[in-house]
A protein has these predicted regions:
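Hydrophobic/aromatic-rich alpha-helical bundle segments in the mid-to-C-terminal region
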Residues: 126-130, 148-196, 203-216
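Amphipathic alpha-helical segments used for helix-helix packing
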Residues: 92, 104-127
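Hydrophobic alpha-helical connector segments
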Residues: 66, 77-109, 159-166, 189, ...
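Short, basic, alpha-helical segments at the C-terminal edge of helix-turn-helix-like DNA-binding modules
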Residues: 69-74
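Short alpha-helical elements of helix-turn-helix
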Residues: 19, 23, 51, 110
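Basic, helix-initiating cap at the start of DNA-binding domains
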Residues: 1-32, 36-45, 61-65
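Short hydrophobic/aromatic patch on the recognition helix
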Residues: 46-57
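Short, solvent-exposed amphipathic helices
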Residues: 107, 128-135, 139-142
């Protein structure tokens, strides 16, 4: 999440305070876990009174909403870069995988895992994560459609399946980045790129012979 993409001098005071609080919330959530982090801890981390904090964010859920909004902006920028890339779509996606997934700082990945865990307990947070997941899958479907139209992906690849598979695969990478102290992005890159190439080549697909979920 790029909290500081706008130069400090250009931000209005309210926006500067909002960024300051969200950065503090990130640190507190990563260090203590979302569930154990209190509003007072975030206020202390931000160096302000609890009253000032509540005036900007009335709850932890509101902070998560702010973080999710920033995440959506970053996602939109990332996909815009991919679609505007002058290289072949496969090469653009390869670079995007390196930049936005494998190079994810561990603390950012841990924040994602904390939010996902809270989504299992908190319906409001769950709704936010579902909205982002749906947006990511929709954008991936468009990207895969573009790859198929250009010949960079197999016409056999179902775009909806491809998007769902890729989201699931990336979530696993984020979990490993968050929890494995010795995670080495460079060592993992050949595997990740190989999976992406296999997906676009149509080598990965649902099992057509799998029984229905309700079958005995």
């Amino acid at each position: 999440m790029s909290l500081t993409s706008v130069p400090v001098g250009r931000r209005p005071p309210d926006a500067e305070r909002r960024v300051r609080i969200l950065e503090a919330a990130e640190r507190a959530f990563v260090r203590n876990g979302f569930h154990a982090t209190t509003m007072q801890r975030v206020a202390d981390e931000a160096g302000m009174s609890a009253g000032n904090l509540y005036r900007t964010f009335p709850s932890k859920e509101a902070m998560v909403e702010g973080l999710c909004e920033l995440d959506q902006v970053e996602l939109a920028q990332a996909f815009a870069e991919l679609m505007a890339d002058n290289r072949q779509i496969m090469e653009a996606m390869r670079c995007g995988l390196r930049k936005h997934v494998l190079a994810k700082p561990p603390e950012k990945a841990r924040l994602l895992v904390e939010i996902w865990a809270e989504a299992g307990r908190n319906p409001r947070v769950a709704a936010m994560t579902r909205a982002i997941d749906a947006e990511v899958r929709a954008r991936l479907e468009k990207l895969i459609d573009a790859a198929k139209a250009s010949g960079a992906a197999s016409p056999r690849l179902d775009s909806r399946f491809g998007a769902l598979f890729f989201v699931t695969f990336v979530a696993g990478l984020f979990k490993r980045i968050a929890t494995e102290a010795d995670f080495d992005p460079e060592a993992e890159t050949p595997m990740a790129i190989g999976v992406l190439k296999a997906l676009l080549a149509g080598a990965l697909c649902p099992d057509p012979g799998a029984p229905d979920a309700g079958a005995q």
